[in-house]
Amino acid sequence: MRKLLISLALAIPVFAVDHNLLQKGYEVYKKHCSACHIERATPEQIKKFRMMAMRGEKLPIAAPPMNEVSARVKKFYPGELEFITFVKDYITNPSREKGVCMPMAFKLFGVMPPIGKALSEEEKEAVAYWLYHNYKESWKEMMRKMHGKMMH
């Protein structure tokens, strides 16, 4: 029991969230990302957006919601370091080839502009960190809520 408690005590800092970095990331999001990406959409809203798109209607959003972006990127890059590395690279040099969006997202929104080129390394790190830690829902869970069943 004592070994378990010591192990847990040593592991806590590894899993702790840096709230200052999280706040800085949110500030970067508000300043540089929120013009196109809304912060969060419910599964019902996302489903509504998809139905509108299928009918050829103009969407009330300019890019996928950030909670959907986070869940989708985590599907391919589940670890924090790999997620942050991907996001920092993608926002600096976005392309359809390295993107992980659903094909419909590229059709509706195209490839995002390279906003990362206007950000410092610290800002890119912060916004990627915020995107990773701010949203907990997995892609599978998001799809299950939208469709009422498990999807892969």
Curated annotation (Swiss-Prot):
Pfam families, sorted: Cytochrome_CBB3
Signal peptide region: 1-16
Domain (Cytochrome c) ranges: 20-135
Binding site for heme c: 33, 36-37
Keyword Metal-binding: yes
GO molecular function, one term: metal ion binding
Keywords: Electron transport, Heme, Iron, Metal-binding, Signal, Transport
Keyword Iron included in the entry's annotation: yes
Entry superkingdom: Bacteria
Protein name: Uncharacterized protein aq_1854
Organism: Aquifex aeolicus (strain VF5)
